[in-house]
Amino acid sequence: MDKIKEILIWTNNEGKYREICDLLPNHIKKYSPKKFGILTPEETGKSFEENSFIKASYFSKKTNFICLSDDSGLEINLLKGGPGIYSSRWSGEKNNFNLAIKKIFEKMSDVKKDWQNDSAARFICCLTLFLPNGKFFSSQGIVKGKTSSTKKGKNGFGYDPIFIPDGYKDTFGEMESKLKMSIDHRFKAYFKIKKYFL
C-alpha cells in the first residue's frame, strides 16, 4: 500500500472530525465532508462496524478518495446497550446532546430509581479505512467506565460530560484533551490501524 498523502474524513460531527485530525500525522492532507455536496447514506447497519463500513465505502466510491469513517457511541448496561448505534440520533436533528443526555437520565431513572449505583457503561468506536481499489481495514476501540449522575465539564463533545472512564474520577468532559485522547475509544481504534498512516 502506497503512503497516504491525503484523506477524506467522513463525519458530520465536528468534534469527531477534530479528534481524528489530531490523531492523524501532519503530513497527510485532510478533507472534511464540507468539500463535497454528497448526502450521507442511511445507516442501516446493526453494529458500529457495519455503519462505519457503509459510510467509508460509499464516500470513497463517490469521491475516489481514500476515506476514513467513524461510527461510535455510548452503551449503557442498564439500558441494555442503549443508546448504542443510535447515540447520535438521540440528539435529534439539531444534534442537541443536552437533550440526549436528559433522555438518558430519564430512561435510566425509569428502569431504576437509584440508577446512580448501577451506571456501568462503555464507549465504542469503529473506524473503517476504505481505499478506491476496494480494499478496506476496520478496527474497534472500547473504553469501559460509568455514567456520572450529572453533566460535568465543558470539554469534548457529545456524551463526554457524563462518561467517567475506569480508573479516573473525572468525566471526559472535565479532562484535558491530551489526556482524553490518549485513553479513549477513538484513540484505541486508531492505534490498531495507525501503521497504514505512517
List where the protein language model places each region.
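Anionic-ligand binding patches
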Residues: D2-W10, E14-L198
